[in-house]
Amino acid sequence: IKIDQGERVFIEGKNGSGKTTLIRILSGLLQSSEGAFYINDDTFRKINLKQYRSQIGNIIHSETPFEGTILDNIIFNNTDCSDEDLKWALDGVQLTPYIKSLPKGLETQIFPEGQQLSSSNAQKILLARSIINKPKVLFYEDPTDAMDEKVANEIIDFITSDINKWTIIVSSKNPYWKTKCNRFLTMEKGQIISDIKK
């Protein structure tokens, strides 16, 4: 599989077909046991993982915010993050109204696993974190599935806008993602059985 910069790739298949494994290998969370994986013509085994991960944003299935402030969760130790970048990310994922409703705003403490957050707001925090550094590649597993359809689709429009030059690799139950992608991979038993470009 070769994915070009700027492609928006939708991965589909039944449960257990290998979607999650493929996304986690491509995002550097898993090492493949066989085969080779190249990034910009360098084999993955030669890649500086820390540098690679600094250029990607990802949300894995069932991920939750960690204990700490909302701000900590979004900037994730990135002291270079500007106020403009923060506002852009919060507005883009429609988190600003929620933040403004909180007495402590971004300094609001999140309990372990984001227990006091709605599932929708928890996903918005993860989405803001994934884009705030304006990464080159986004890897998403069910990133908007806890949101109502209207809000989810508006956020998908923002994420997939042509203004954003990142590559997107996504697996989701929300069919709207598929309409915004230009390449479609179908997985079955750990194999890519179909690869269609729009």
Regions found by a protein language model. Give the residues of each.
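The feature captures the beta-strand-to-loop junction immediately N-terminal to the Walker
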Residues: 12-14
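Helix-to-loop junction immediately C-terminal to a conserved catalytic motif
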Residues: 27
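Conserved ABC transporter NBD signature motif
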Residues: 35-44, 52
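Conserved "ABC signature" C-loop
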Residues: 63-109
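ABC-fold ATPase nucleotide-binding domain signature/coupling loops
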Residues: 96-125, 143, 190
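Catalytic Walker B motif of ABC-type/P-loop ATPase nucleotide-binding domains
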Residues: 138-142
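Conserved catalytic loops of ABC-family nucleotide-binding domains
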Residues: 158-172, 178
